[in-house]
Curated annotation (Swiss-Prot):
Record bears the keyword Cell membrane: no
Disulphide-bridged cysteine pairs: none
Domain of life of the organism encoding this protein: Bacteria
Organism of provenance: Buchnera aphidicola subsp. Acyrthosiphon pisum (strain APS) (Acyrthosiphon pisum symbiotic bacterium)
Protein name listed in UniProt: 5-amino-6-(5-phosphoribosylamino)uracil reductase
Binding-site positions, NADP(+): W8, D38, S72
Molecular-function GO terms, alphabetical: 5-amino-6-(5-phosphoribosylamino)uracil reductase activity; diaminohydroxyphosphoribosylaminopyrimidine deaminase activity; NADP binding
Keywords recorded for this protein, A-Z: NADP, Oxidoreductase, Riboflavin biosynthesis
Length: 207
């Protein structure tokens, strides 16, 4: 919501389902805006994984996905919750700072692109780092850019049986003036009920 209220829209079952997708990913990609607004952990709650996922990732060999945070203005601080969790964290920045960071946190410097991080360059870097499965949990700005740039292979949406009205935050920002005829087009890959909620898995239609 625009007033900052965000916990919880979906059910416990839906949130547990998200853990499965996180566990199967090499990277969880987000932005400093999400860190500042929600102060999330963005980690895998291993004990909440279903039996099938646990059988794939036994505790002895399980590794948390790398949390990659786009932070062009160095807004993420050592005091944020995500920094206090286990697992690697990469802060993608235009310049490093001299603050004391834990060993699991690395500042990675990207080239300045109009005072912003070049997302295409970042994704290329991830690919060169042999990372090929990126799970994105972000706000409307980053999500909108990725969708508008056709950089998404799958879109996963959890829908709760609630109506929030015009004060709800948008899923993504689309800055072009769209008509129905040139809207972003998707096709359904899977629809299923998760507890009281619905999970949609969509893939973009080829241009």
């Amino acid at each position: 919501m625009r007033n900052g209220d965000s916990k919880w829209i979906t059910s416990k079952q839906a949130r547990q389902d998200v853990q499965k997708f996180r566990a199967k990913s090499s990277v969880i990609l987000s932005s400093s805006s999400t860190i500042l607004s929600d102060n999330p952990l963005l980690n895998v709650r291993y004990k909440e994984l279903d039996k099938k996922t646990l059988s794939i990732f036994p505790n002895k060999i399980f590794q948390h996905p790398i949390r990659v945070i786009i932070d062009s203005k160095n807004r993420v601080q050592p005091s944020h919750n995500i920094i206090k969790t286990k697992g690697k964290i990469w802060l993608i920045r235009l310049k490093s700072d001299r603050k004391i960071w834990p060993k699991n946190t690395t500042q990675i410097i990207e080239k300045d692109h109009n005072k912003k991080i070049n997302i295409f360059s970042l994704l290329k870097f991830l690919g060169q780092s042999e990372i090929n499965n990126v799970w994105i949990e972000a706000g409307s700005t980053l999500s909108g850019f990725l969708l508008n740039s056709y950089l998404i292979d799958e879109l996963i949406i959890y829908m709760a049986p609630k109506i929030l009205g015009h004060e709800a935050k948008p899923l993504c920002m689309i800055y072009e003036k769209l008509k129905i005829s040139n809207s972003l087009q998707f096709k359904f890959k899977n629809i299923c009920q998760i507890g009281p909620d619905i999970r949609l898995i969509l893939s973009p239609k080829k241009i």
